């Protein structure tokens, strides 16, 4: 069969969108908005902790992000609602000749809580990953946000020798900046092995929790046994607790973050931690 010259045999890149919303109805958090375009969606909402906390698992069926792809995710948590968003597995950014993009917009209304707890991001050598995250908190809204990034695939003998990983994160409360961070990591750069950079570690992770805790609780978190060899620490900033670590494997970094999350969640968010089942599959 002869096809016209202008017939596309495949789509070279994806532009996917996901828009989520949550509201509080009586004593239950329910989805109020769920719109998707392209290969980005959520599974059925879950209530592992009871009706107050609505859990959604964000799924990207292609399994990886390639050059030219763009993922746009937005979520709004209405007043007094509680949403927990996670993922079924690692997000993979493949080697590519052109950049790929992810834009994340999160809005949390007064009295509401949002937990953004995806599994790790794996950035292949020669990938060109560019991520932008903007989080707006209103009134006394609460946030738990983490990010685990693995550069290259050391288990397969692949170092992050070429390409780049670029990340931009802003968190504001009622328009006032709480956290601003820009990262640009170049494949093969000397900072990957430098003591003032990643010091030879291939995984770095950050946990951000709104609120303030006692010095005793911070010390208790610091004294937790770490998966070897993880190097991590915590800092109390005005209105924000920051936990960061370096590791050789994403599994170890995530295990450390989960420990910190279990310790801090009751104090800062007001509920005991319940590990999502999807993390164990």
UniProtKB/Swiss-Prot annotation:
Name listed for the protein in its UniProt record: Urease accessory protein UreD
Main location: cytoplasm
A GO term from the CC aspect: cytoplasm
Function field: Required for maturation of urease via the functional incorporation of the urease nickel metallocenter.
Locations listed in the record: Cytoplasm
Transmembrane segments: none
Phylogenetic placement of the source organism: Bacteria, Pseudomonadati, Pseudomonadota, Gammaproteobacteria, Pseudomonadales
HAMAP family, alphabetized: UreD
């Amino acid at each position: 069969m002869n096809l016209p010259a202008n017939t596309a045999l495949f789509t070279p890149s994806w532009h996917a969108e996901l828009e989520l919303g949550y509201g509080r109805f009586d004593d239950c958090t329910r989805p109020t908005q769920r719109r998707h375009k392209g290969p980005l969606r959520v599974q059925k909402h879950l209530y592992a902790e009871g009706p107050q906390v609505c859990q959604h698992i964000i799924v990207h069926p292609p399994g990886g992000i390639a050059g030219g792809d763009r993922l746009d995710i937005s979520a709004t948590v209405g007043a007094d609602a509680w949403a927990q968003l996670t993922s079924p597995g690692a997000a993979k950014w493949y080697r590519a000749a052109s950049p790929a993009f992810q834009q994340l917009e999160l809005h949390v209304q007064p009295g509401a809580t949002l937990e953004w707890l995806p599994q790790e991001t794996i950035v292949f050598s020669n990938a060109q990953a560019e991520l932008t995250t903007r989080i707006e908190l209103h009134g006394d809204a609460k946030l738990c946000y983490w990010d685990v990034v693995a550069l290259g695939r050391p288990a397969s003998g692949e170092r992050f020798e070429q390409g780049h990983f670029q990340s931009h994160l802003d968190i504001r409360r009622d328009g006032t900046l709480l956290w601003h961070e820009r990262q640009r990591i170049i494949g093969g750069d000397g900072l990957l092995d430098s003591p003032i950079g990643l010091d030879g570690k291939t995984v770095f992770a950050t946990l951000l929790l709104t609120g303030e805790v006692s010095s005793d609780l911070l010390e208790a978190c610091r004294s937790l046994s770490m998966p070897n060899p993880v190097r991590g620490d915590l800092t109390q900033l005005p209105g924000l607790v920051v936990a960061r670590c370096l590791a050789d494997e994403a599994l170890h970094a995530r295990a450390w973050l989960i420990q910190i999350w279990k310790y801090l969640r009751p104090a800062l968010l007001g509920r005991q931690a319940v590990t999502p089942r999807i993390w164990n599959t």
